[in-house]
Design a protein with these regions (language model features):
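Zinc-coordinating Cys/His ligand positions in small cysteine/histidine-rich zinc-finger domains
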Residues: 60-63
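A boundary/linker detector
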Residues: 1-36, 73-88
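A contiguous, mid-protein "functional segment" used to position or interact
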Residues: 66
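Histidine-centered nuclease catalytic patch
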Residues: 29-58, 69-73
Length: 88
């Protein structure tokens, strides 16, 4: 059974993924070369990241795979800069 936190975050995600696509202009926010096809949580939900707009990045399939790969930490830092979020 889903927790209240997850249900609330799912509702927020549905709303903010549209805003994230608008912000990106439909392009991948990492490579800026290909159309965005997926919305990525910069701070993973499994690490208690939420679906606030500043934690979402629109990525193409290739960049989304890279964002979960061996360079995930560096990509995360770059995406935080791209979407205009200061790191704590």
């Amino acid at each position: 059974m889903a927790t209240k936190r997850k249900i609330k975050d799912d509702v927020l995600f549905r709303k903010n993924k549209i805003l994230a696509y608008e912000r990106s202009g439909g392009m991948c926010e990492l490579c800026r070369c290909r159309p965005a096809q997926e919305v990525h949580h910069i701070v993973y939900r499994s690490h208690l990241g939420t679906s606030i707009l500043s934690n979402l990045a629109c990525l193409c399939l290739q960049c989304h795979n890279e964002a979960h790969g061996v360079n995930a930490k560096e990509i995360r830092k770059h995406l935080l800069d791209v979407v205009g979020v200061e790191q704590s």
